[in-house]
Curated annotation (Swiss-Prot):
Residues 1-44 have a biased composition (Basic residues). Residues 1-53 are annotated as: Disordered. It comes from Invertebrate iridescent virus 6 (IIV-6). A motif (Bipartite nuclear localization signal) lies at residues 25-42. This is Uncharacterized protein 366R.
Length: 114
């Protein structure tokens, strides 16, 4: 009767056999070429409030209290057909502008310098 080998209770993990002459396989998802080096990402520049436009139906006392409560100090005031606009910062030549409309119908004109 042949001798039986005794098995251990804990399974042993064996590493796969590797040939000493062969190089290790590359994974199929990785390409052999290196990707070109990308330039580091620029940090996003934040936008600042350049001016604030209030609808004409707002009372003057409500406008001044809103500006004071939100810590804005206008440089200049301008009136258009539908809005009263308060300039907070002077505009820059190469700036990018965007308008953000608040729920209470106040328009914030945002500016990003370049």
């Amino acid at each position: 009767m042949p001798l039986l080998r005794k098995r251990s209770l804990s399974p042993k993990r064996r590493s796969p056999r590797r040939s000493p002459t062969r190089s290790p396989r590359r994974s199929p998802t990785r390409s052999p070429r290196r990707s070109p080096r990308r330039s580091p990402r620029r940090s996003p520049k934040s936008m600042t409030v350049q001016s604030i436009a209030f609808p004409k139906n707002w009372k003057r006392s409500h406008i001044t209290s809103w500006l004071k409560n939100h810590n804005y100090h206008p440089i200049k005031e301008d009136s258009t057909a539908n809005f009263i606009r308060f300039r907070i910062l002077p505009p820059h030549r190469n700036a990018i502008f965007a308008t953000k409309i608040l729920p209470n119908d106040i328009h914030l004109i945002m500016m990003r310098n370049y």
